[in-house]
Amino acid sequence: MTRQEIFAKLSEVFSDVFDEDITVTENTTAADIEDWDSLAHITLIAEVEDAFDIKFSMKEVLGMQNVGEMADIIEKNA
Protein backbone atom coordinates (compact mmCIF):
# COMPACT_ATOMS: atom_id res chain seq x y z
CA MET A 1 0.00 0.00 0.00
CA THR A 2 1.41 3.37 -0.99
CA ARG A 3 1.54 6.33 1.37
CA GLN A 4 -1.03 8.09 -0.81
CA GLU A 5 -3.38 5.10 -0.45
CA ILE A 6 -2.85 5.10 3.31
CA PHE A 7 -3.81 8.77 3.53
CA ALA A 8 -6.85 8.28 1.31
CA LYS A 9 -8.05 5.47 3.56
CA LEU A 10 -7.24 7.46 6.71
CA SER A 11 -9.27 10.39 5.36
CA GLU A 12 -12.23 8.03 4.89
CA VAL A 13 -11.90 6.71 8.46
CA PHE A 14 -11.58 10.22 9.91
CA SER A 15 -14.62 11.35 7.92
CA ASP A 16 -16.65 8.41 9.25
CA VAL A 17 -15.57 8.88 12.87
CA PHE A 18 -16.06 12.65 12.95
CA ASP A 19 -19.09 12.63 10.63
CA GLU A 20 -17.70 15.35 8.36
CA ASP A 21 -15.60 15.54 5.21
CA ILE A 22 -12.00 15.49 6.44
CA THR A 23 -8.83 15.22 4.40
CA VAL A 24 -5.92 14.47 6.69
CA THR A 25 -2.31 15.41 6.00
CA GLU A 26 1.05 14.49 7.50
CA ASN A 27 0.72 17.31 10.02
CA THR A 28 -2.93 16.94 11.05
CA THR A 29 -3.31 16.80 14.86
CA ALA A 30 -6.16 16.63 17.34
CA ALA A 31 -5.99 20.43 17.61
CA ASP A 32 -7.00 20.67 13.94
CA ILE A 33 -10.28 18.75 14.33
CA GLU A 34 -12.85 20.31 16.64
CA ASP A 35 -14.49 17.10 17.88
CA TRP A 36 -11.27 15.14 18.42
CA ASP A 37 -11.38 14.51 22.16
CA SER A 38 -10.25 11.53 24.23
CA LEU A 39 -13.39 9.49 23.53
CA ALA A 40 -13.21 10.19 19.82
CA HIS A 41 -9.53 9.23 19.93
CA ILE A 42 -10.39 5.76 21.26
CA THR A 43 -12.99 5.30 18.53
CA LEU A 44 -10.59 6.59 15.90
CA ILE A 45 -7.81 4.21 16.92
CA ALA A 46 -10.21 1.24 16.87
CA GLU A 47 -11.56 2.22 13.43
CA VAL A 48 -8.07 2.72 11.99
CA GLU A 49 -7.00 -0.67 13.36
CA ASP A 50 -10.04 -2.29 11.73
CA ALA A 51 -9.56 -0.48 8.41
CA PHE A 52 -5.91 -1.50 8.11
CA ASP A 53 -6.18 -4.85 9.93
CA ILE A 54 -3.45 -3.91 12.41
CA LYS A 55 -3.17 -3.43 16.17
CA PHE A 56 -1.32 -0.46 17.65
CA SER A 57 0.67 -0.99 20.82
CA MET A 58 -0.04 1.32 23.74
CA LYS A 59 3.40 2.85 23.22
CA GLU A 60 2.55 3.60 19.58
CA VAL A 61 -0.81 5.15 20.48
CA LEU A 62 0.72 7.35 23.16
CA GLY A 63 3.63 8.34 20.93
CA MET A 64 1.61 9.54 17.92
CA GLN A 65 1.88 13.31 17.62
CA ASN A 66 0.19 13.69 14.23
CA VAL A 67 -1.43 11.70 11.44
CA GLY A 68 1.91 11.40 9.65
CA GLU A 69 3.27 9.39 12.57
CA MET A 70 0.14 7.22 12.48
CA ALA A 71 0.75 6.62 8.76
CA ASP A 72 4.38 5.69 9.51
CA ILE A 73 3.21 2.97 11.90
CA ILE A 74 0.59 1.73 9.43
CA GLU A 75 3.15 1.65 6.63
CA LYS A 76 5.56 -0.32 8.83
CA ASN A 77 2.91 -2.87 9.88
CA ALA A 78 0.75 -3.20 6.77
Residue ranges and their predicted role:
Residues 2-36, 40-46, 50-78:
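Phosphopantetheine-dependent thiolation modules in NRPS/PKS and related acyl-activating systems
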